[in-house]
């Protein structure tokens, strides 16, 4: 691809490109030095973005002369740099005769460019500099993103920008990547949401381009007949037709100053072609109105019953300033007392509900109410439909009061005022998408902005929610039909309702939210790490005051530990039932608190259960008190017990249908950790219980407790101590930590054992686990460096070159403190024995490469691991979880991560060569081919001994 003279000279004369490519700058005006008047002359406008008052980062938006919009965010505290390019083209632009082409093109861009022709050049550079990368193709967007060590950002941008300047579309990789796309398709073919969309696409208007087959397969991406344009020529043609600077939006989040980031962008992205393209629009309606109403049933592969009510509505994206659908979705999706869900739950018909707008194409969208059904609910679909329309009618009569809109707007303003930022990669991806859709001033504010109710637009959306404009879509495992969707093999049929349903009574709109916080002042004070606040034999509490995240929020974690929690599969089931019941029983009363920024959840673990409280400091004490009172004294009704047991049993029954990689990982944990129980064991044990068993267990569980607690956030020690005293008074712990059994890592067999997961999937898989010799930090550090060294060549050889499958990865995978390396391949075509042989060959070759490895070769891998370990926390919740996990590992100095990072830098070639043979000898394979019977994992586990903490 030819370059302009100016761009070729940029590396010597950067001013040329700055003058020649920047058409406008917005958000942060530049400070121009004398002699830079030519740059100042090209500023078209300046604008100020709406940002949180506590957002201290610097922003700048550039519009280059080629039309590329660029959002730069300088965050001096960031320890990663990230970039995301969003291209406003996606699967909706696929040609009819080459479905999946946009997705296939996304794959091809990673496989070499003119300056970097090696197919792994980009990935290798990113991986060697503590980074990660990926991309996704949606209906109207294709997004490419990466993060990396900040010092390596210029080199990453060099490689990244060439995706959009000089991709090779290497013919040598065309067939292999077509196979990879097919593998991705096969890996998703049993996904329930894709199966539902496949049926919906048969019902919607075929002239709407979002109804095509987005993923692609060997069939749809087959080489055209001789005499027609080749597949490679079609890919290149699509690229030139649709990839244009005018439909691209780039976001970069990095610690470097804005001027430096701008210089790098101008140098590298100015020559992206400007063909004066505009964002593609869709005019054909998504749904032909004369085809509604319709009643559809689809077979689900999972044991799950659900009904979705779809209503075609105008796409509300352009109405983001007033958000006319927000109050409607909020009230229909409400879960408090008197809500649609509460009425259906009380009748035993449903156990979950959501409402909102999705599948927007810029012209039309779907307002969707999704209801998760009980078996009884599946028998009363007409009554559920009638109750839904009764709730909608209630909204029409009294739901659009202005105070409801204002309450939502106030809550949005609270959330935006203390907006938390994610990791740089998440931020860059979100911002590039936001820049593609919203005005510059709203790139941060759009999701929160509510300028005032637009009564006319609200009414228009409410008027669309009628029986005549409805597509009712029911899915269940017992649906059978001869009609099958074309790409995801979903059986479906059209039904006619027998008779109108009978609406249930009890619906009521919520009143004003009593949980809205009023004291949102930020307390001054910053601790470096958690401090021990209470230390008794039966109760330990830690406290860390924080103001660095600029939010008056607090994260509490309270671990209730009992020796009764995991003695057996029966005890493990009862622990899960108790945690699930507590969540279920508090759902209605605490739903308004959740809306107001206060959340609570209970989750089970091997030693008991953890209570998690997250939200504003103001109002958290009564929430803690209510949850503890509910746990200790609330009645457990028969209906509540059956509801939560059914939900857990549904999860365990569906385990064989879950992702194969997830099943393999669970099998590995069941084999090398104790105590652990399989889904089948938990399901069998759950059949033996009734409400009385759970009540008895609650008494035993609460009678024998040891409690660990931690508060991290914007609260002082006095308030933390007051809340701790409340917990001690309510829970009355009396056991010591020594009475609680720990989850223990086990040593893998030296016999290279093979276990099969319990799965009904159609793909093959091998998860090979290489285990370290002990649990020392030095062993962990060495294994981490080895894993980093293996990552890129494993992916390159087994995925790119050998085309074994879409899911191919290698990485460090500890089980608690036990170090290990996991190699994983999932394939639609290659059976597990062959995959295992390819892994053997790769590891044999790695042994040979190890002999040639020098300390200089090893240095970038050590540095990459070190940088990953030293990454800063990007959210209050993330920091709280990290410190909380440290207490579970008895890291009460909270310095394990820093010490590990130091050890990593000192890992020597001798350390690696000493560990490598042992890793090869202590392996466990989790293998699966379709039809394999599950292994007796418990027998394998019972024959294992604990992995030593330190080698003798």
Short names for language-model regions:
Residues 1-11:
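N-terminal secretory signal peptides that target proteins for export/translocation
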Residues 178, 182-185, 191-247, 253-265, ...:
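Hydrophobic, small-residue-rich alpha-helical packing segments that form membrane-like cores
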Residues 234-267, 691-727:
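Non-catalytic, conformational "gating/processing" segments within enzyme and secreted inhibitor domains
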Residues 16-28:
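Bacterial N-terminal signal peptides
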Residues 52-84:
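Mature N-terminal segment immediately following signal peptide/propeptide cleavage
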Residues 31-35, 40, 44:
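Boundary at the C-terminal end of the N-terminal hydrophobic targeting segment
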Residues 186, 278-337, 425-441, 446, ...:
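His/Glu-based metal-binding/catalytic segments typifying zinc-dependent metallopeptidases
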Residues 73, 78-94, 101-102, 119-163, ...:
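M16 family metallopeptidases and their MPP-like homologs
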